[in-house]
Design a protein with these regions (language model features):
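Contiguous interface-forming segments/domains that mediate binding rather than catalysis
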Residues: 3-237
Length: 237
């Protein structure tokens, strides 16, 4: 079961649904880096796939997102940018479902089913390794047809306004960028994309962010500085 099984109906009800969108890659000429060397660099950055994730699974999944027959060569010709996405993938064949607990691979279109707001919030907590926890998450629709998400974050009750039913609230993602400063956490949420509409959210300290970008040559940003999502409403009315 490959990349698009990440979104299959066999997954848990709150998991993302299938959206077959091809991920773009960096266009500039880059010096190829072998698959194994890339993995070694990621491991030095504490990014390691679940033990059940095999090279064959990764190559199959990358093929399904790129349709590149020479899949390993494709990964090597686009060092780190393609392989980084795989740490945010998910597969029901894996006992722990996630390829890792380091990041989330996502796309705004996955919010098309509103239950994905709950799934995304749960995963945003999971990648912080317990530093930020989301509990009692529920969705509701008010009399004006606006959707809301209610939850507790580190025990603090909150309620975020989303959008009218049928519309996607991209500002929902931006809201998470404010939580680390509000909660005085040691790390912050990160953002990366390689030119496509899909992106990866991670969680890092200042030192980890600098080291990640230096070792991979990628331009991973802080979520609050990335300007890829709308600002949330200034009020909840």
């Amino acid at each position: 079961m490959g990349l698009f099984s990440f979104f299959s109906k066999k997954n848990k009800p709150t998991e993302p649904i299938e959206k077959p969108v091809v991920v773009a890659v960096q266009k500039q000429e880059l010096k190829p880096v072998s698959y194994d060397d890339q993995l070694q660099v990621f491991e030095s950055l504490r990014h390691k796939h679940d033990p059940e994730v095999t090279k064959e699974m990764i190559l199959r999944d990358v093929y399904e997102m790129s349709w590149e027959d020479a899949t390993e060569q494709y990964i090597e010709s686009n060092p780190f940018s393609v392989l980084y996405y795989t740490f945010g993938w998910r597969n029901p064949q894996i006992k722990n479902y996630n390829y890792s607990e380091k990041c989330i691979w996502f796309d705004l279109e996955f919010f098309d089913a509103n239950v994905q707001y709950k799934w995304f919030m749960e995963r945003m907590g999971a990648i912080t390794n317990g530093e930020i926890t989301f509990t009692d998450i529920s969705l509701e629709t008010d009399s004006d047809n606006w959707e809301w998400i209610n939850f507790n974050v580190n025990g603090i009750p909150k309620k975020w306004k989303l959008e009218r039913v049928g519309y996607i609230a991209d500002h929902f993602v931006h809201r998470f960028s404010k939580l680390p400063s509000e909660l005085s956490t040691s790390r912050r949420f990160t953002y990366f994309d390689n030119g496509g509409q899909q992106w990866v959210i991670g969680y890092a300290s200042e030192a980890e962010q600098i080291r990640f970008n230096e070792k991979t040559g990628l331009n991973r940003e802080w979520l609050e500085e990335s300007n890829h999502f709308s600002e949330p409403p200034t009020n909840n009315k």
